[in-house]
Amino acid sequence: MIAWALIFLAVAIAAGVLGFGGIIGAQAWIAQVLFILFLVFFLVSLLSGRKPPVT
């Protein structure tokens, strides 16, 4: 999933350089949504404070 987010991020950066339009604009929107989603998941994991299992 992270690989897809990075691919969409690269496409979004290219779209920003060339101008947002068509399918590139849609991919830029998807990249923004994925970024916010992963940021929320990261913050939730930080706040939950779970420790890794001890083996």
Curated annotation (Swiss-Prot):
Q: Which residues form the signal peptide?
A: none
InterPro entries in the record: DUF1328
Task: State the superkingdom.
Answer: Bacteria
- Where is the protein localized? Cell membrane
Pfam annotation, one family: DUF1328
Task: Name the principal localization, coarsely classed.
Answer: membrane
Q: How does it sit in the membrane?
A: Multi-pass membrane protein
List the transmembrane segments: 4-24, 28-48
Cystine bridges: which residues?
Answer: none
List, alphabetically, the HAMAP family matched.
UPF0391 (MF_01361)
Supply the name of the protein. UPF0391 membrane protein Sfum_0248
Q: What is the source species? A: Syntrophobacter fumaroxidans (strain DSM 10017 / MPOB)
